[in-house]
C-alpha cells in the first residue's frame, strides 16, 4: 500500500530540492509554482466583480509568464475575445481602480502632476505569448510604453531607460 501524499509534504520536498540546486549551481529564486486550480467561469466572474482590480505580482526575475503577459492576456483573451467587459472598464480596473485599492494617490488617473505609465496598444491585436516554458516571450500589439514621461518600450523592445521607482507603503 502506498502512503498518502500530502500537499504540504510535497511543497517542502520541492523547497528542499530547490535549495540544494541553488547551493550546487549558485542560482537563486529557482523554485516556482504555477497553480491552475480555478475554472475559467470562476475567473471571469471574479474579474467582473465591481471591486476586482487587475494587478500582477511579477518580480524582477521573469521566471513566470505573468511578468510578460498578464495585461495582454487580460485585454486580448478576456476583453476582446471573450467580451467579459468593455475596454474602458478593463483599463480602469488595471489603472485607476488598482491605484485606489493600493492607496497610491499620485497614480491611476491622467491629470497634471500625477505619475503615470502609459501603454499604447492595438486593442485588435494585443495578446500574450508568454508560457511557463518561455516566460519572457513578448506579447503582440504593444506599440510603446512611457513611464513618468520617458519611453521605455518601442519598436518591439526595451529602450534601456528606467525612470520608474520602487513604491514603498
Predicted regions and their residues:
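Active-site microenvironment of metallo-dependent hydrolases
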Residues: 2-169
